[in-house]
Regions:
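Rossmann-fold NAD(P) dinucleotide-binding segment
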Residues: 37-100
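Solvent-exposed polar/charged
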Residues: 7, 42, 66, 132-136
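NAD(P)+-binding Rossmann beta1-loop-alpha1 motif at the extreme N-terminus of oxidoreductases
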Residues: 1-49, 72
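Active-site loop signature of alpha/beta-hydrolase-fold enzymes
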Residues: 21, 56, 107
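Active-site-adjacent beta-strand anchor residues
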Residues: 16, 50, 78, 120-121
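Rossmann-fold dinucleotide-binding core
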Residues: 80-159
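Short beta-to-alpha linker loops that shape the active-site pocket of alpha/beta-hydrolase fold enzymes
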Residues: 19, 52, 105
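Short secondary-structure transition/capping segments
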Residues: 27-28, 46-48, 62, 112-115, ...
Length: 159
């Protein structure tokens, strides 16, 4: 996903991970690499998050939130509990930061090929801004409703 954003979006992509292997791949692809969540928050207008669970998502958001400012956007691709998604969105919204849940479906190969399916929960204006970025790694993008709706549809998709 990160590689496709880098090669297709026309924007500067800055990666952050606690695992050095993905950062080595990012450097090899001439992407920027951040040293901390604070660096990400201070240097990125749109922040994409992809975590294995809601627990890690909460930790990442707790690390980002103090450093983010009004006008930025979070695009969360994690499959996370709906209640957590809505809670995080409300916390960011209180700071003037937009939040979209955009969980992904399909395979690792689909991620490489840019053919993922993405179910988005966001305000329409936020969706209009982020959809061209999501299209860098997905070819099946659906606005499902407000924040949390992407998670609901992803859960139904997994049943």
């Amino acid at each position: 996903m990160c590689h496709n954003l880098h090669t297709k979006s026309g924007r500067t992509v800055i990666a952050y991970d606690i695992d050095p292997a993905p950062l080595d791949r990012a450097r090899a692809a001439n992407m920027g690499v951040a040293d901390s969540l604070e660096d990400i928050a201070k240097n990125c207008g749109t922040v994409f998050i992809s975590m294995p669970s809601g627990v890690q998502l909460q930790l990442i958001c707790d690390g980002l939130m103090p450093h983010m400012t009004s006008g930025q956007t979070i695009v969360d691709t994690t499959t996370a509990p709906v209640a957590l998604t809505k809670e995080l969105a409300a916390q960011f919204k209180a700071k003037g930061i937009d939040y979209a849940d955009a969980p992904i479906a399909r395979t690792r190969q689909a991620a490489r090929d840019g053919t993922l399916a993405v179910m988005v929960g966001a305000e329409e204006a936020v969706f209009a801004r982020i959809e061209p970025l999501i299209a860098c790694y997905a070819n099946d993008i659906t606005l499902c409703g407000g924040v949390g709706s992407g998670q609901v549809v992803k859960i139904l998709n997994n049943m």
